[in-house]
């Protein structure tokens, strides 16, 4: 059925196809014009160097601004650090590369959308996660679904998952 399965359903369909076709790398790339394809080669190279997930990060060498928009990113990064001891500078980045092990992880597990909270689970599975510095543009297309109500719901879901679900999932 090719019905609207929203972000995760569409993403998982891509991971399933990539697993079936034996792809080495999957690139997660937002369609709103923020991400530049010029970083894909560097991300793939990091997968080839043994990393399982490469995050295109705005904040490897740049400071994260203190804006209302970045408060959520800071909270999620802090929660991941508390639970895993690992520092993720840009956990909400939708610009990522995944190697074969993670392609399989995301293709087969309905409880594992490629969202910030599942980085906790990936660390527990001993997946290597690396961030590389990228520049992102302002949104060119579409509108964010994150209004005040949806932001509160999203942040609540992320915090519950990071603190109460991901640390206890069977690895």
Predicted regions and their residues:
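Residue-level "edge-of-site" marker
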Residues: 31, 59, 135
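Active-site-adjacent helix/loop segment of glycosyltransferases
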Residues: 171
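Catalytic donor-sugar/metal-binding loop of nucleotide-sugar-dependent glycosyltransferases
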Residues: 86-87, 109-110, 120-137
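A short, conserved beta-strand element in the Rossmann-like catalytic core
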Residues: 34
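Cell-envelope/extracellular polymer assembly enzymes that use nucleotide-activated donors
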Residues: 117
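Acceptor/aglycone-binding surface of glycosyltransferases and processive sugar-polymer synthases
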Residues: 2-20, 25, 37-112, 139-149, ...
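Short amphipathic alpha-helical segments at helix boundaries and their inter-helical linkers
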Residues: 1-2, 124
């Amino acid at each position: 059925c090719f019905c609207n399965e929203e972000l995760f359903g569409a993403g998982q369909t891509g991971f399933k196809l990539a697993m079936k076709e034996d792809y080495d790398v999957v690139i997660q790339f937002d369609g709103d014009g923020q991400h530049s394809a010029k970083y894909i080669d560097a991300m793939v190279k990091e997968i080839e160097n043994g990393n399982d997930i490469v995050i295109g990060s705005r904040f490897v060498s740049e400071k994260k601004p203190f804006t209302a928009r970045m408060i959520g990113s800071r909270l999620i990064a802090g929660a991941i650090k508390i639970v895993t001891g690992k520092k993720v500078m840009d956990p909400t980045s939708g610009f990522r590369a995944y190697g074969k092990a993670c392609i399989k992880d995301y293709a087969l597990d309905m409880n594992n959308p490629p969202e910030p909270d599942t980085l906790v689970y990936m660390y527990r599975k001993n997946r290597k996660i690396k961030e590389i510095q990228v520049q992102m543009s302002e949104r060119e297309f579409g509108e964010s679904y994150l209004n005040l109500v949806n932001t509160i719901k999203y942040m609540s879901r992320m915090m519950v998952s990071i603190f109460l679900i991901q640390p206890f999932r069977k690895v």
